[in-house]
Amino acid sequence: MLLFQHPLAGIQLVKGTVETFDESYITAAKRELAEESGITHVISARYLCSWDSGFQNQAWHFVLCECADLEDSWTFHTKDDGGHDFAFFWHDIGSDISSQAHTVFQHALEKVRKLIDQGGV
């Protein structure tokens, strides 16, 4: 699973807001992926599910994006919050992130694990 180290806020998943101009959750996910990671070529994208995060009344929508030829790790300078360097890496879905991430990201990772266990991914 693609994660990144935010310089101020620990380990996170690519996420963001569905804007009024987004045609779908898939469109929003692809836009956020490009804005936060620099990944602009998505081979395919599939909506997985919605999830009540329990954090600030946020509903999250999981989208699986298939991309080709990505590095094992890279840094991308995003314009989010005035500009940050996000350090991206591939994370073993079974490994814990509890000491390095906000609980909402820990719970999101658990949700993805359940989707995999149920054959949804």
Predicted regions and their residues:
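N-terminal strand-loop-strand
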Residues: M1-V14
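Short, solvent-exposed aromatic-acidic interface loops
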Residues: H6-A9, D80-H84
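Short, catalytically relevant binding-site loops at active-site mouths
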Residues: A9-G10, V18-E19, D96
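The catalytic Nudix box helix
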Residues: L13-L48
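Surface-exposed beta-strand edges and their flanking turn/coil or helix-capping segments
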Residues: K15-E19, I26-A28, T75-T78, T103-V104, ...
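A short helix-to-beta-strand connector/capping loop
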Residues: I43, H84-F86
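Active-site-adjacent beta-strand/loop module that shapes the phosphate/pyrophosphate-binding cleft
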Residues: D52-H77, F86-S95, F105-G120
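Surface-exposed, interaction-prone regions with an acidic/low-complexity signature
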Residues: Q100
